[in-house]
Amino acid sequence: MDYKSKVAELIKKHVELEIEAIEKLIEIPPKPEMGDYAFPCFQLSKVMRKAPNMIAEELKNSMSTDGFERIENLGPYVNFFVDKGVFAENTIKKALEDGENYGASNIGEGKTVCVEYSSPNIAKPFHVGHLFTTAIGNSLYKMFKKEGYNTVGLNHLGDWGTQFGKLISAYDRWVDEEALEKAPIDELLRIYVKFHEEAEKDPSLEDEARANFKALETGDEKATALWTRFRDLSLKEFERVYNILGVKFDSLAGEAFYNDKMDVVVNELKEKGLLVESNGAQVVMLEEYNMPPCIVLKGDGASIYATRDLAAAMYRKKTYDFHKCVYVVGTPQALHFKQVFKVLELAGHEWAKDCVHVGFGLVKFADRKLSTRNGSIVLLDDLLREAVEKTMEVINEKNPELENKEEVAKKIGVGAVIFTYLKNSREKDIVFDWKEILSFDGETGPYVQYSYARGNSILNRGKECTGTVDYSKLSSKEEFELVKSIANFNSVITLALDKLEPSILTRYVIEVAKGFNKFYNAHSVLNLEDEDLKATRLNLVKASLQVIKNGLELLGIDVVEKM
Protein backbone atom coordinates (compact mmCIF):
# COMPACT_ATOMS: atom_id res chain seq x y z
CA MET A 1 0.00 0.00 0.00
CA ASP A 2 1.31 3.49 -0.80
CA TYR A 3 1.47 6.08 1.97
CA LYS A 4 -1.32 8.17 0.53
CA SER A 5 -3.69 5.21 0.93
CA LYS A 6 -2.30 4.65 4.44
CA VAL A 7 -3.04 8.29 5.33
CA ALA A 8 -6.54 7.98 3.83
CA GLU A 9 -7.31 4.81 5.80
CA LEU A 10 -6.11 6.43 9.01
CA ILE A 11 -8.39 9.44 8.44
CA LYS A 12 -11.33 7.19 7.42
CA LYS A 13 -11.46 5.74 10.94
CA HIS A 14 -12.40 9.17 12.30
CA VAL A 15 -14.54 10.87 9.61
CA GLU A 16 -17.71 10.16 7.64
CA LEU A 17 -16.15 10.26 4.16
CA GLU A 18 -15.54 7.58 1.54
CA ILE A 19 -11.90 6.53 1.06
CA GLU A 20 -11.88 7.82 -2.57
CA ALA A 21 -13.12 11.24 -1.43
CA ILE A 22 -10.42 11.40 1.26
CA GLU A 23 -7.68 10.46 -1.23
CA LYS A 24 -8.79 13.27 -3.54
CA LEU A 25 -8.52 15.80 -0.69
CA ILE A 26 -5.03 14.76 0.44
CA GLU A 27 -2.37 17.24 -0.67
CA ILE A 28 1.41 17.29 -0.96
CA PRO A 29 2.59 20.30 1.12
CA PRO A 30 4.67 22.93 -0.72
CA LYS A 31 7.54 22.70 1.81
CA PRO A 32 9.14 19.57 3.37
CA GLU A 33 8.97 21.12 6.86
CA MET A 34 5.16 21.09 6.53
CA GLY A 35 5.11 17.31 6.21
CA ASP A 36 4.90 14.77 3.40
CA TYR A 37 1.09 14.64 3.17
CA ALA A 38 -1.55 17.08 4.38
CA PHE A 39 -5.29 16.71 4.91
CA PRO A 40 -7.40 19.92 4.79
CA CYS A 41 -10.39 19.93 7.17
CA PHE A 42 -12.52 22.65 5.51
CA GLN A 43 -14.96 20.16 3.97
CA LEU A 44 -15.62 18.53 7.36
CA SER A 45 -16.53 21.76 9.16
CA LYS A 46 -20.11 21.89 7.80
CA VAL A 47 -20.84 18.27 8.70
CA MET A 48 -19.11 18.34 12.10
CA ARG A 49 -20.21 21.93 12.86
CA LYS A 50 -16.78 22.90 14.11
CA ALA A 51 -13.99 25.17 12.94
CA PRO A 52 -11.51 23.44 10.58
CA ASN A 53 -8.65 24.28 13.00
CA MET A 54 -10.42 22.49 15.85
CA ILE A 55 -11.18 19.44 13.69
CA ALA A 56 -7.52 19.26 12.63
CA GLU A 57 -6.39 19.28 16.27
CA GLU A 58 -8.93 16.60 17.29
CA LEU A 59 -7.94 14.36 14.38
CA LYS A 60 -4.25 14.72 15.19
CA ASN A 61 -4.84 13.80 18.85
CA SER A 62 -6.92 10.72 18.01
CA MET A 63 -4.63 9.16 15.39
CA SER A 64 -2.02 6.45 15.86
CA THR A 65 1.43 7.47 14.62
CA ASP A 66 2.33 3.89 13.73
CA GLY A 67 4.44 3.98 10.52
CA PHE A 68 4.81 7.76 10.77
CA GLU A 69 7.62 9.81 12.24
CA ARG A 70 4.97 12.19 13.62
CA ILE A 71 1.57 13.75 12.92
CA GLU A 72 0.98 17.48 13.52
CA ASN A 73 -1.83 19.97 13.05
CA LEU A 74 -1.10 23.32 11.47
CA GLY A 75 -4.14 25.59 11.24
CA PRO A 76 -6.90 23.73 9.34
CA TYR A 77 -4.48 21.02 8.14
CA VAL A 78 -3.36 17.69 9.58
CA ASN A 79 0.24 17.15 8.45
CA PHE A 80 1.77 13.69 8.21
CA PHE A 81 5.53 13.13 8.42
CA VAL A 82 6.40 9.63 7.24
CA ASP A 83 9.05 7.43 8.81
CA LYS A 84 11.66 7.81 6.06
CA GLY A 85 13.27 4.38 6.46
CA VAL A 86 9.95 2.52 6.57
CA PHE A 87 8.60 4.66 3.73
CA ALA A 88 11.64 3.99 1.52
CA GLU A 89 11.50 0.26 2.26
CA ASN A 90 7.76 -0.05 1.51
CA THR A 91 7.98 2.04 -1.66
CA ILE A 92 11.11 0.53 -3.22
CA LYS A 93 10.17 -3.05 -2.31
CA LYS A 94 6.74 -2.62 -3.89
CA ALA A 95 8.20 -1.09 -7.07
CA LEU A 96 10.69 -3.96 -7.42
CA GLU A 97 8.21 -6.72 -6.55
CA ASP A 98 5.46 -5.40 -8.85
CA GLY A 99 7.88 -4.67 -11.71
CA GLU A 100 5.97 -3.85 -14.88
CA ASN A 101 2.72 -3.93 -12.87
CA TYR A 102 3.90 -1.17 -10.53
CA GLY A 103 1.37 1.66 -10.61
CA ALA A 104 -1.52 -0.67 -11.48
CA SER A 105 -4.73 -0.98 -9.49
CA ASN A 106 -8.05 -2.83 -9.72
CA ILE A 107 -10.18 0.30 -9.33
CA GLY A 108 -11.81 -0.36 -12.72
CA GLU A 109 -12.51 -4.05 -12.19
CA GLY A 110 -15.80 -5.13 -13.74
CA LYS A 111 -16.21 -1.83 -15.63
CA THR A 112 -15.76 -1.21 -19.36
CA VAL A 113 -14.38 1.99 -20.87
CA CYS A 114 -14.58 2.70 -24.61
CA VAL A 115 -11.97 5.07 -26.05
CA GLU A 116 -12.50 6.37 -29.60
CA TYR A 117 -9.32 7.79 -31.12
CA SER A 118 -7.31 8.29 -34.33
CA SER A 119 -10.23 7.80 -36.77
CA PRO A 120 -8.52 8.85 -40.04
CA ASN A 121 -10.32 9.20 -43.37
CA ILE A 122 -9.92 6.35 -45.84
CA ALA A 123 -7.89 7.23 -48.97
CA LYS A 124 -6.29 10.26 -47.31
CA PRO A 125 -2.82 10.48 -45.76
CA PHE A 126 -2.13 10.80 -42.04
CA HIS A 127 -1.17 14.37 -41.25
CA VAL A 128 0.38 15.69 -38.04
CA GLY A 129 -3.04 16.47 -36.53
CA HIS A 130 -3.93 12.76 -36.59
CA LEU A 131 -1.11 11.99 -34.19
CA PHE A 132 -2.66 14.25 -31.55
CA THR A 133 -5.83 12.14 -31.24
CA THR A 134 -3.84 8.92 -31.70
CA ALA A 135 -1.26 9.71 -28.99
CA ILE A 136 -3.81 10.99 -26.45
CA GLY A 137 -6.23 8.11 -27.07
CA ASN A 138 -3.51 5.46 -26.97
CA SER A 139 -2.21 6.81 -23.64
CA LEU A 140 -5.70 7.00 -22.08
CA TYR A 141 -6.42 3.47 -23.35
CA LYS A 142 -3.24 2.14 -21.69
CA MET A 143 -3.90 3.99 -18.42
CA PHE A 144 -7.49 2.72 -18.17
CA LYS A 145 -6.17 -0.81 -18.73
CA LYS A 146 -3.53 -0.26 -16.02
CA GLU A 147 -6.30 0.68 -13.59
CA GLY A 148 -8.12 -2.60 -14.20
CA TYR A 149 -10.82 -1.44 -16.61
CA ASN A 150 -11.89 -3.64 -19.49
CA THR A 151 -10.81 -1.17 -22.18
CA VAL A 152 -12.04 -1.08 -25.78
CA GLY A 153 -10.00 0.92 -28.31
CA LEU A 154 -12.23 2.17 -31.15
CA ASN A 155 -10.95 3.49 -34.48
CA HIS A 156 -14.05 5.15 -35.96
CA LEU A 157 -12.76 5.23 -39.55
CA GLY A 158 -14.00 7.89 -41.98
CA ASP A 159 -14.96 5.24 -44.55
CA TRP A 160 -18.22 6.61 -45.96
CA GLY A 161 -19.44 9.71 -47.76
CA THR A 162 -19.74 11.44 -51.13
CA GLN A 163 -15.94 11.48 -51.59
CA PHE A 164 -16.15 7.80 -52.51
CA GLY A 165 -18.36 8.65 -55.48
CA LYS A 166 -15.64 11.08 -56.62
CA LEU A 167 -12.92 8.48 -56.06
CA ILE A 168 -14.77 5.93 -58.19
CA SER A 169 -15.04 8.45 -61.06
CA ALA A 170 -11.36 9.36 -60.65
CA TYR A 171 -10.33 5.69 -60.50
CA ASP A 172 -12.16 4.89 -63.75
CA ARG A 173 -10.32 7.70 -65.56
CA TRP A 174 -6.85 8.28 -64.15
CA VAL A 175 -5.63 5.52 -61.85
CA ASP A 176 -2.11 4.11 -62.22
CA GLU A 177 -2.53 0.52 -60.96
CA GLU A 178 1.17 0.04 -60.30
CA ALA A 179 1.32 3.23 -58.21
CA LEU A 180 -1.87 2.20 -56.39
CA GLU A 181 -0.30 -1.05 -55.22
CA LYS A 182 3.04 0.57 -54.35
CA ALA A 183 1.83 3.69 -52.49
CA PRO A 184 -1.98 3.45 -52.26
CA ILE A 185 -2.71 6.60 -50.25
CA ASP A 186 -0.48 8.77 -52.46
CA GLU A 187 -2.16 7.49 -55.61
CA LEU A 188 -5.70 7.80 -54.22
CA LEU A 189 -4.92 11.35 -53.10
CA ARG A 190 -3.45 12.17 -56.53
CA ILE A 191 -6.54 11.04 -58.43
CA TYR A 192 -8.85 12.71 -55.88
CA VAL A 193 -7.07 16.06 -56.37
CA LYS A 194 -7.17 15.48 -60.15
CA PHE A 195 -10.95 14.93 -59.94
CA HIS A 196 -11.45 18.36 -58.32
CA GLU A 197 -9.23 20.05 -60.89
CA GLU A 198 -11.16 18.46 -63.78
CA ALA A 199 -14.58 19.03 -62.16
CA GLU A 200 -13.95 22.78 -62.20
CA LYS A 201 -13.71 22.55 -66.00
CA ASP A 202 -16.45 19.93 -66.36
CA PRO A 203 -19.18 20.19 -63.67
CA SER A 204 -20.92 17.06 -65.03
CA LEU A 205 -18.25 15.05 -63.17
CA GLU A 206 -19.91 16.06 -59.89
CA ASP A 207 -23.23 14.62 -61.11
CA GLU A 208 -21.48 11.40 -62.10
CA ALA A 209 -19.82 11.23 -58.65
CA ARG A 210 -23.20 11.65 -56.94
CA ALA A 211 -24.60 8.84 -59.07
CA ASN A 212 -21.62 6.65 -58.14
CA PHE A 213 -22.17 7.26 -54.43
CA LYS A 214 -25.89 6.51 -54.84
CA ALA A 215 -24.89 3.22 -56.49
CA LEU A 216 -22.60 2.49 -53.55
CA GLU A 217 -25.41 3.23 -51.07
CA THR A 218 -27.75 0.82 -52.86
CA GLY A 219 -25.15 -1.98 -52.87
CA ASP A 220 -24.03 -1.87 -56.53
CA GLU A 221 -21.49 -4.69 -57.01
CA LYS A 222 -18.82 -2.70 -58.88
CA ALA A 223 -19.04 0.36 -56.60
CA THR A 224 -18.92 -1.84 -53.47
CA ALA A 225 -15.91 -3.78 -54.78
CA LEU A 226 -14.00 -0.54 -55.43
CA TRP A 227 -14.97 0.90 -52.03
CA THR A 228 -13.76 -2.30 -50.34
CA ARG A 229 -10.48 -2.10 -52.25
CA PHE A 230 -9.91 1.56 -51.33
CA ARG A 231 -10.63 0.71 -47.69
CA ASP A 232 -8.39 -2.38 -47.59
CA LEU A 233 -5.46 -0.59 -49.27
CA SER A 234 -5.82 2.37 -46.89
CA LEU A 235 -6.00 0.11 -43.82
CA LYS A 236 -2.81 -1.65 -44.90
CA GLU A 237 -1.07 1.73 -45.06
CA PHE A 238 -2.57 2.87 -41.75
CA GLU A 239 -1.38 -0.37 -40.15
CA ARG A 240 2.18 0.42 -41.25
CA VAL A 241 2.02 3.82 -39.48
CA TYR A 242 0.34 2.34 -36.39
CA ASN A 243 3.14 -0.24 -36.18
CA ILE A 244 5.76 2.55 -36.16
CA LEU A 245 3.81 4.21 -33.33
CA GLY A 246 3.08 0.95 -31.48
CA VAL A 247 -0.68 1.61 -31.52
CA LYS A 248 -3.40 -1.05 -31.65
CA PHE A 249 -7.21 -1.05 -31.70
CA ASP A 250 -9.91 -3.50 -30.68
CA SER A 251 -12.43 -2.32 -33.29
CA LEU A 252 -12.16 -0.73 -36.73
CA ALA A 253 -15.92 -0.21 -37.09
CA GLY A 254 -16.11 3.04 -39.05
CA GLU A 255 -18.91 5.19 -40.39
CA ALA A 256 -20.01 2.58 -42.94
CA PHE A 257 -20.58 0.05 -40.14
CA TYR A 258 -23.50 2.15 -38.87
CA ASN A 259 -25.32 2.47 -42.23
CA ASP A 260 -27.94 -0.11 -41.27
CA LYS A 261 -28.24 1.13 -37.69
CA MET A 262 -29.43 4.70 -38.30
CA ASP A 263 -33.09 4.07 -39.15
CA VAL A 264 -33.62 2.78 -35.61
CA VAL A 265 -32.23 6.07 -34.24
CA VAL A 266 -34.39 8.22 -36.53
CA ASN A 267 -37.52 6.19 -35.67
CA GLU A 268 -36.81 6.43 -31.93
CA LEU A 269 -36.43 10.22 -32.12
CA LYS A 270 -39.68 10.44 -34.14
CA GLU A 271 -41.58 8.24 -31.67
CA LYS A 272 -40.37 10.35 -28.75
CA GLY A 273 -41.54 13.53 -30.50
CA LEU A 274 -38.06 15.02 -30.69
CA LEU A 275 -37.77 15.40 -34.48
CA VAL A 276 -39.18 18.53 -36.09
CA GLU A 277 -38.92 19.85 -39.64
CA SER A 278 -36.74 22.89 -40.25
CA ASN A 279 -36.00 24.17 -43.78
CA GLY A 280 -36.77 20.70 -45.15
CA ALA A 281 -34.39 18.95 -42.73
CA GLN A 282 -35.31 16.81 -39.71
CA VAL A 283 -33.76 18.31 -36.56
CA VAL A 284 -33.85 18.16 -32.76
CA MET A 285 -34.33 21.68 -31.35
CA LEU A 286 -31.80 22.54 -28.64
CA GLU A 287 -32.42 26.27 -28.32
CA GLU A 288 -33.31 26.09 -24.61
CA TYR A 289 -29.87 24.55 -23.99
CA ASN A 290 -28.15 27.43 -25.84
CA MET A 291 -27.27 25.24 -28.82
CA PRO A 292 -28.28 25.33 -32.48
CA PRO A 293 -30.57 22.54 -33.75
CA CYS A 294 -28.99 19.10 -34.15
CA ILE A 295 -29.59 18.04 -37.78
CA VAL A 296 -30.45 14.34 -37.97
CA LEU A 297 -31.59 14.09 -41.61
CA LYS A 298 -30.77 16.59 -44.37
CA GLY A 299 -33.44 17.92 -46.72
CA ASP A 300 -32.77 15.11 -49.22
CA GLY A 301 -33.20 12.49 -46.48
CA ALA A 302 -29.48 11.77 -46.20
CA SER A 303 -27.93 11.20 -42.79
CA ILE A 304 -25.06 13.27 -41.42
CA TYR A 305 -22.32 12.85 -38.79
CA ALA A 306 -24.70 13.39 -35.87
CA THR A 307 -26.94 10.52 -37.01
CA ARG A 308 -23.96 8.17 -37.20
CA ASP A 309 -22.61 9.27 -33.83
CA LEU A 310 -26.02 8.72 -32.23
CA ALA A 311 -26.19 5.25 -33.80
CA ALA A 312 -22.60 4.51 -32.75
CA ALA A 313 -23.23 5.56 -29.12
CA MET A 314 -26.34 3.37 -28.90
CA TYR A 315 -24.57 0.41 -30.49
CA ARG A 316 -21.59 0.77 -28.12
CA LYS A 317 -23.82 0.94 -25.04
CA LYS A 318 -25.72 -2.15 -26.18
CA THR A 319 -22.55 -4.07 -27.15
CA TYR A 320 -20.12 -3.07 -24.40
CA ASP A 321 -22.41 -1.69 -21.66
CA PHE A 322 -19.72 0.91 -21.03
CA HIS A 323 -19.07 2.68 -17.73
CA LYS A 324 -17.62 5.55 -19.78
CA CYS A 325 -17.26 6.28 -23.52
CA VAL A 326 -14.46 8.74 -24.33
CA TYR A 327 -14.26 10.54 -27.69
CA VAL A 328 -10.77 11.90 -28.45
CA VAL A 329 -11.62 14.39 -31.20
CA GLY A 330 -10.34 17.95 -31.87
CA THR A 331 -11.74 20.84 -29.81
CA PRO A 332 -13.54 22.38 -32.87
CA GLN A 333 -15.97 19.41 -32.61
CA ALA A 334 -16.97 20.31 -29.02
CA LEU A 335 -20.38 21.70 -30.03
CA HIS A 336 -21.14 18.66 -32.20
CA PHE A 337 -20.60 16.29 -29.26
CA LYS A 338 -22.56 18.51 -26.85
CA GLN A 339 -25.48 18.27 -29.29
CA VAL A 340 -25.17 14.50 -29.72
CA PHE A 341 -24.96 13.86 -25.96
CA LYS A 342 -27.91 16.20 -25.29
CA VAL A 343 -30.06 14.41 -27.92
CA LEU A 344 -29.23 11.06 -26.28
CA GLU A 345 -30.24 12.51 -22.91
CA LEU A 346 -33.51 13.93 -24.28
CA ALA A 347 -34.26 10.52 -25.80
CA GLY A 348 -34.21 9.13 -22.27
CA HIS A 349 -30.77 7.51 -22.28
CA GLU A 350 -29.48 8.38 -18.81
CA TRP A 351 -26.09 6.90 -19.77
CA ALA A 352 -25.53 9.95 -22.01
CA LYS A 353 -23.78 11.48 -18.97
CA ASP A 354 -21.12 8.75 -19.32
CA CYS A 355 -20.15 9.97 -22.81
CA VAL A 356 -17.24 12.43 -22.70
CA HIS A 357 -15.58 14.51 -25.40
CA VAL A 358 -11.80 14.93 -24.96
CA GLY A 359 -10.69 17.86 -27.12
CA PHE A 360 -7.21 18.93 -28.17
CA GLY A 361 -5.47 21.84 -29.90
CA LEU A 362 -3.64 22.41 -33.18
CA VAL A 363 -0.13 21.51 -34.36
CA LYS A 364 2.13 24.35 -35.52
CA PHE A 365 5.77 24.60 -36.54
CA ALA A 366 8.26 27.13 -35.20
CA ASP A 367 10.23 27.36 -38.44
CA ARG A 368 8.13 25.54 -41.09
CA LYS A 369 11.34 23.92 -42.32
CA LEU A 370 9.86 20.44 -42.14
CA SER A 371 10.10 18.93 -45.63
CA THR A 372 6.62 18.21 -47.00
CA ARG A 373 5.20 16.75 -50.16
CA ASN A 374 2.82 19.64 -50.52
CA GLY A 375 2.69 23.06 -48.95
CA SER A 376 -0.64 22.90 -47.15
CA ILE A 377 -0.38 19.95 -44.78
CA VAL A 378 2.52 18.37 -42.93
CA LEU A 379 2.33 14.61 -43.34
CA LEU A 380 2.94 12.39 -40.33
CA ASP A 381 5.28 10.15 -42.32
CA ASP A 382 7.51 13.14 -43.06
CA LEU A 383 7.49 14.26 -39.43
CA LEU A 384 8.49 10.83 -38.10
CA ARG A 385 11.10 10.29 -40.82
CA GLU A 386 12.71 13.65 -40.10
CA ALA A 387 12.68 12.99 -36.34
CA VAL A 388 14.53 9.69 -36.83
CA GLU A 389 17.01 11.23 -39.30
CA LYS A 390 17.83 14.13 -36.99
CA THR A 391 18.27 11.72 -34.06
CA MET A 392 20.65 9.62 -36.16
CA GLU A 393 22.72 12.76 -36.84
CA VAL A 394 23.04 13.34 -33.08
CA ILE A 395 24.02 9.68 -32.47
CA ASN A 396 26.64 9.77 -35.25
CA GLU A 397 28.09 12.91 -33.72
CA LYS A 398 28.09 11.81 -30.06
CA ASN A 399 28.38 8.00 -30.12
CA PRO A 400 29.09 6.70 -33.65
CA GLU A 401 30.03 3.21 -32.38
CA LEU A 402 26.66 2.64 -30.68
CA GLU A 403 25.13 -0.80 -31.35
CA ASN A 404 21.73 -1.01 -33.08
CA LYS A 405 21.93 2.67 -34.06
CA GLU A 406 18.91 2.52 -36.38
CA GLU A 407 16.69 0.94 -33.71
CA VAL A 408 17.84 3.44 -31.06
CA ALA A 409 17.32 6.41 -33.44
CA LYS A 410 13.79 5.19 -34.19
CA LYS A 411 12.88 4.80 -30.50
CA ILE A 412 14.30 8.20 -29.56
CA GLY A 413 12.99 10.06 -32.64
CA VAL A 414 9.45 8.64 -32.60
CA GLY A 415 9.39 8.82 -28.79
CA ALA A 416 10.45 12.49 -28.88
CA VAL A 417 7.54 13.33 -31.19
CA ILE A 418 4.93 11.46 -29.09
CA PHE A 419 6.35 13.01 -25.90
CA THR A 420 5.95 16.50 -27.41
CA TYR A 421 2.28 15.82 -28.19
CA LEU A 422 1.64 14.68 -24.62
CA LYS A 423 3.83 17.12 -22.68
CA ASN A 424 1.45 20.03 -22.18
CA SER A 425 -2.27 20.36 -21.54
CA ARG A 426 -4.02 18.72 -24.52
CA GLU A 427 -6.13 21.81 -25.29
CA LYS A 428 -3.00 23.89 -25.90
CA ASP A 429 -1.60 24.15 -29.42
CA ILE A 430 1.72 22.38 -30.01
CA VAL A 431 4.59 24.34 -31.52
CA PHE A 432 7.21 22.04 -33.01
CA ASP A 433 10.79 23.17 -32.62
CA TRP A 434 13.30 20.47 -33.57
CA LYS A 435 16.08 21.91 -31.43
CA GLU A 436 13.92 21.71 -28.33
CA ILE A 437 12.16 18.41 -29.12
CA LEU A 438 15.35 16.43 -29.71
CA SER A 439 17.38 18.04 -26.93
CA PHE A 440 18.88 15.66 -24.37
CA ASP A 441 18.54 18.41 -21.75
CA GLY A 442 15.33 19.86 -20.40
CA GLU A 443 11.79 18.54 -20.38
CA THR A 444 11.95 16.29 -23.43
CA GLY A 445 11.51 12.66 -24.40
CA PRO A 446 15.24 12.18 -25.16
CA TYR A 447 16.12 13.58 -21.70
CA VAL A 448 13.89 10.99 -19.99
CA GLN A 449 15.17 8.16 -22.23
CA TYR A 450 18.76 9.25 -21.58
CA SER A 451 18.08 9.20 -17.82
CA TYR A 452 16.85 5.62 -18.15
CA ALA A 453 19.91 4.55 -20.19
CA ARG A 454 22.19 6.27 -17.68
CA GLY A 455 20.55 4.39 -14.79
CA ASN A 456 20.77 1.13 -16.72
CA SER A 457 24.51 1.64 -17.14
CA ILE A 458 24.86 2.12 -13.34
CA LEU A 459 22.96 -1.13 -12.68
CA ASN A 460 25.13 -3.06 -15.14
CA ARG A 461 28.29 -1.80 -13.44
CA GLY A 462 26.91 -2.58 -9.98
CA LYS A 463 26.02 -6.22 -10.62
CA GLU A 464 28.86 -7.53 -8.42
CA CYS A 465 27.68 -5.67 -5.31
CA THR A 466 27.47 -8.03 -2.29
CA GLY A 467 26.09 -5.62 0.32
CA THR A 468 22.92 -6.06 2.39
CA VAL A 469 20.10 -3.64 1.69
CA ASP A 470 19.30 -1.30 4.60
CA TYR A 471 16.71 1.35 3.70
CA SER A 472 17.33 3.38 6.86
CA LYS A 473 20.56 4.49 5.15
CA LEU A 474 18.58 6.51 2.57
CA SER A 475 18.53 9.63 4.72
CA SER A 476 19.46 12.47 2.35
CA LYS A 477 17.00 15.04 0.98
CA GLU A 478 17.62 13.94 -2.66
CA GLU A 479 17.02 10.27 -1.84
CA PHE A 480 13.83 10.95 0.09
CA GLU A 481 12.41 13.29 -2.58
CA LEU A 482 13.04 10.60 -5.22
CA VAL A 483 11.38 7.91 -3.08
CA LYS A 484 8.35 10.21 -2.62
CA SER A 485 8.09 10.68 -6.39
CA ILE A 486 8.24 6.91 -6.95
CA ALA A 487 5.47 6.40 -4.37
CA ASN A 488 3.16 8.84 -6.18
CA PHE A 489 2.96 6.83 -9.42
CA ASN A 490 -0.49 5.30 -8.94
CA SER A 491 -1.99 8.56 -7.65
CA VAL A 492 -0.71 10.32 -10.78
CA ILE A 493 -2.33 7.73 -13.09
CA THR A 494 -5.62 8.10 -11.18
CA LEU A 495 -5.48 11.90 -11.48
CA ALA A 496 -4.57 11.76 -15.20
CA LEU A 497 -7.62 9.55 -15.84
CA ASP A 498 -9.85 11.68 -13.65
CA LYS A 499 -8.93 14.73 -15.76
CA LEU A 500 -8.53 12.68 -18.99
CA GLU A 501 -5.20 14.47 -19.33
CA PRO A 502 -2.08 12.41 -20.25
CA SER A 503 0.16 15.47 -19.73
CA ILE A 504 -0.22 14.92 -15.96
CA LEU A 505 1.60 11.60 -16.40
CA THR A 506 4.16 13.12 -18.81
CA ARG A 507 5.05 15.86 -16.30
CA TYR A 508 5.38 13.23 -13.59
CA VAL A 509 7.78 11.11 -15.66
CA ILE A 510 9.90 14.25 -16.20
CA GLU A 511 9.81 14.87 -12.43
CA VAL A 512 11.05 11.32 -11.68
CA ALA A 513 13.84 11.61 -14.28
CA LYS A 514 14.89 14.97 -12.82
CA GLY A 515 14.77 13.57 -9.28
CA PHE A 516 16.88 10.60 -10.33
CA ASN A 517 19.54 12.83 -11.95
CA LYS A 518 19.55 15.16 -8.94
CA PHE A 519 20.12 12.19 -6.64
CA TYR A 520 22.84 10.71 -8.87
CA ASN A 521 24.65 14.04 -9.25
CA ALA A 522 24.63 14.59 -5.46
CA HIS A 523 25.53 11.07 -4.29
CA SER A 524 27.85 8.35 -5.46
CA VAL A 525 26.23 4.98 -6.11
CA LEU A 526 29.17 2.79 -7.13
CA ASN A 527 32.25 4.45 -5.60
CA LEU A 528 31.40 3.64 -2.00
CA GLU A 529 33.24 1.72 0.69
CA ASP A 530 29.93 0.99 2.42
CA GLU A 531 28.66 -2.02 0.41
CA ASP A 532 25.29 -1.94 2.21
CA LEU A 533 24.69 1.67 1.20
CA LYS A 534 25.75 0.77 -2.35
CA ALA A 535 23.24 -2.13 -2.47
CA THR A 536 20.49 0.13 -1.11
CA ARG A 537 21.17 2.93 -3.59
CA LEU A 538 21.28 0.42 -6.45
CA ASN A 539 17.75 -0.65 -5.45
CA LEU A 540 16.69 3.01 -5.48
CA VAL A 541 18.11 3.31 -9.02
CA LYS A 542 16.28 0.12 -10.05
CA ALA A 543 12.95 1.39 -8.66
CA SER A 544 13.41 4.77 -10.39
CA LEU A 545 14.00 3.06 -13.74
CA GLN A 546 10.96 0.83 -13.25
CA VAL A 547 8.77 3.91 -12.82
CA ILE A 548 10.31 5.69 -15.82
CA LYS A 549 9.85 2.58 -17.97
CA ASN A 550 6.26 1.98 -16.84
CA GLY A 551 5.42 5.67 -17.22
CA LEU A 552 6.83 5.91 -20.75
CA GLU A 553 5.04 2.69 -21.71
CA LEU A 554 1.72 4.27 -20.65
CA LEU A 555 2.55 7.23 -22.89
CA GLY A 556 3.23 4.86 -25.80
CA ILE A 557 7.03 5.35 -25.75
CA ASP A 558 9.79 2.72 -25.66
CA VAL A 559 12.82 2.97 -23.39
CA VAL A 560 16.37 2.75 -24.72
CA GLU A 561 18.68 0.46 -22.73
CA LYS A 562 21.88 2.05 -24.02
CA MET A 563 22.76 5.28 -25.79
Swiss-Prot record:
One matching Pfam family: DALR_1
Protein family according to the UniProt entry: Belongs to the class-I aminoacyl-tRNA synthetase family.
InterPro entries the record matches: aa-tRNA-synth_I_CS, Arg-tRNA-ligase, Arg-tRNA-synth_N, Arg-tRNA-synth_N_sf, ArgRS_core, DALR_anticod-bd, Rossmann-like_a/b/a_fold, tRNAsynth_Ia_anticodon-bd
Quaternary structure annotation from Swiss-Prot or TrEMBL: Monomer.
Catalytic activity: tRNA(Arg) + L-arginine + ATP = L-arginyl-tRNA(Arg) + AMP + diphosphate
Lineage start: Bacteria, Bacillati, Bacillota, Clostridia, Eubacteriales
Class of the enzyme per the UniProt entry, highest EC level: ligase
Domain of life: Bacteria
Name listed for the protein in its UniProt record: Arginine--tRNA ligase
Biological processes annotated in GO: arginyl-tRNA aminoacylation
Coiled coil, from the record: none
Residue positions of motif 'HIGH' region: 120-130
Gene name of this polypeptide: argS
Its EC number(s): 6.1.1.19
Location relative to the cell: Cytoplasm
Keywords of the record: Aminoacyl-tRNA synthetase, ATP-binding, Cytoplasm, Ligase, Nucleotide-binding, Protein biosynthesis
HAMAP family: Arg_tRNA_synth (MF_00123)
GO terms for MF: arginine-tRNA ligase activity; ATP binding
